[in-house]
Amino acid sequence: MARVKRGVIARTRHKKILKQAKGYYGARSRVYRVAFQAVIKAGQYAYRDRRQRKRQFRQLWIARINAAARQNGISYSKFINGLKKASVEIDRKILADIAVFDKVAFTALVEKAKAALA
């Protein structure tokens, strides 16, 4: 049976991992064994954080809507309930944007929600 020489394949694999680890600190960007572990861990963090980003943005939007709603004398939960009863279908991302950049329009939405609750 012929001898299998894997030098070219190994070098290619090592170069690929070291390229992915470019910019990492110390041995993580220079030593293959350490870089491989760092790249694997980075992938795990990226996978986890792609899901967490969605949760974190929703939390941020809710916090902004709550703050703006309370300035207008209504809690977040009552505000959202009022909008649902008034059949206003604006998602939290847009509501948060309106709360930050267009106070007049947000106040109008609050009044609409209060009217639907009364």
From Swiss-Prot:
<dbReference type="GO" id="GO:0006412">
    <property type="term" value="P:translation"/>
</dbReference>
<keyword id="KW-0687">Ribonucleoprotein</keyword>
<keyword id="KW-0699">rRNA-binding</keyword>
<comment type="function">
    <text>Binds directly to 23S ribosomal RNA and is necessary for the in vitro assembly process of the 50S ribosomal subunit. It is not involved in the protein synthesizing functions of that subunit.</text>
</comment>
<dbReference type="GO" id="GO:0019843">
    <property type="term" value="F:rRNA binding"/>
</dbReference>
<dbReference type="GO" id="GO:1990904">
    <property type="term" value="C:ribonucleoprotein complex"/>
</dbReference>
<keyword id="KW-0689">Ribosomal protein</keyword>
<dbReference type="InterPro" id="IPR005813">
    <property type="entry name" value="Ribosomal_bL20"/>
</dbReference>
<dbReference type="GO" id="GO:0000027">
    <property type="term" value="P:ribosomal large subunit assembly"/>
</dbReference>
<dbReference type="GO" id="GO:0003735">
    <property type="term" value="F:structural constituent of ribosome"/>
</dbReference>
<dbReference type="Pfam" id="PF00453">
    <property type="entry name" value="Ribosomal_L20"/>
</dbReference>
<protein>
    <recommendedName>
        <fullName>Large ribosomal subunit protein bL20</fullName>
    </recommendedName>
</protein>
<comment type="similarity">
    <text>Belongs to the bacterial ribosomal protein bL20 family.</text>
</comment>
<keyword id="KW-0694">RNA-binding</keyword>
<dbReference type="InterPro" id="IPR035566">
    <property type="entry name" value="Ribosomal_protein_bL20_C"/>
</dbReference>
<dbReference type="InterPro" id="IPR049946">
    <property type="entry name" value="RIBOSOMAL_L20_CS"/>
</dbReference>
<dbReference type="GO" id="GO:0005840">
    <property type="term" value="C:ribosome"/>
</dbReference>
